[in-house]
Regions:
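Phosphate/dinucleotide-binding and metal-coordinating scaffold of catalytic cores
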Residues: 1-173
Length: 173
């Protein structure tokens, strides 16, 4: 559940207004958990246009989906809705470490939003959560440059500058 006034604020000037974290409550197995709610996808209109918007929930450390702290609920771009999900499943079966991914039915404020794709947000604990190594692995998280005006960059520039990357693990690099 999220306060309708908070949703109005997030929806007020999309995509610019959707990035603020708002307090919300996640109901899982009849237990309420405090979370932060925000929209996703400023660079991809399919995430924020229409009634079914992609969003992220940030949970406390002891949340219902631990060890995962950030969960992305994606409105899949493909019409059959399973292309990415099946790709992740196949990669996992082949031994590739993949983010946790499920197809889930979503309700927000007692309103059905249908099936969405749930992804964990990988971070510095990705390898540790999967027990892939005995030692810490250097992990960097890439973020697109901040939007400073109301213009989006013409092309995605994530790989063009080292300043777009943040060190997010405890390992020596």
């Amino acid at each position: 559940h999220i306060d309708p006034a908070c949703l109005d604020t997030l929806n007020s000037d999309l995509p610019w207004s959707g990035d603020d974290n708002m307090p919300a409550v996640l109901l899982e197995n009849n237990v309420e958990y405090p979370v932060k709610f925000r929209y996703r996808g400023i660079y991809s209109a399919s995430h924020y246009l229409g009634g079914k918007k992609s969003f992220r929930l940030s949970l406390k450390k002891e949340g219902p989906f631990k060890p995962y702290r950030k969960l992305n609920f994606i409105n899949p771009k493909s019409f059959n809705m399973v292309n990415n999900h099946m790709g992740m499943w196949i990669a996992g079966r082949m031994g590739v470490a993949t983010p946790w991914n499920e197809m889930v039915f979503v309700r927000i404020n007692d309103e059905d939003h249908g099936v969405m794709e749930l992804y964990e947000q990988p971070g510095g604990d990705f390898e540790r959560n999967r027990k892939l190594t005995k030692e810490e692995v250097p992990v960097y998280r890439g973020e697109y440059p901040p939007i400073t005006g109301r213009e989006l960059t013409e092309k995605r520039t994530l790989w063009r500058k080292a300043s777009n990357w943040e060190y997010v693990s405890d390992a020596d690099s």
